[in-house]
Amino acid sequence: GLGDVYKRQRPDTQLYIMDALERYIHDFSSPEEELLHELDRQTHLQVVQPRMLSGHIQGKLLELLVRMLRPRNILEIGTFTGYSALCMAAGLEEDGVLDTVEVDDELEEFAASFFRRSPHGQKIRQHIGSALDIVPTLGYTFDLVFIDGDKREYPDYYRMLMGDGGSKVLVHSGSILIADNILWSGKIVEPVAHNDRHTQALLEFNRMI
C-alpha cells in the first residue's frame, strides 16, 4: 500500500513530500489574518520552541470545527502564545466562552497582548497554572476540549474530564475531544525507551480513548 511505499522512502524524501504537502494545503486555504501572522512571527522571534505554535493550517481547521460544532463552552489545555485560542475564538459565537490554561507564566503577557488586540479576545478567559488544579474550579461542563498541554499529563487530563475518582464530570455525551500530537511524530509505533515518559503517556492516553 501507499504506507509501505512511504516507509521505504529516504528520510529526506519524506521531509520534501511533507513540506510540499503543507505548501499545497496552504495555497488552497483562506489567507492568514494579519494579527495571527504577526503572532506567528513574534513567537518565532521571541519564544523558545516556536514550533509548538499551532500555525495557520491547524488554526483554520480548529476555527472550522468550532463553526460547525457550535459549542458554547470550550476548554483549551495549553495556551502557548495564544494562536489556537484566537482561531477557536474566531469561530465561537458571541456569547460563547473559551477557557484556556497555560502552565508557563512567562507566556501570560505575550498571549494576553494579542488577545487584547483581537475582536474575539473578549470571548477568551486566560488562566495560568496547572490545568489539573484550575479546570475543576471553572464551574463549566465543556462542549469542546482541545488538549495540547504537557504530553506526560494527557492521561491525567482525560481522567479529570471524565470525573475519575468521584470528581465532577466536565464533559457531556455530545462533547468533542481534540488532542494534538497523539502520534508523536511516529514515536508511538517505535520501541519506547524506559525513560521516555512523553511517549509512554501518549500510548496510555490513546488506549484510554
Regions found by a protein language model. Give the residues of each.
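Class I SAM-dependent transferase core
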Residues: 8-75
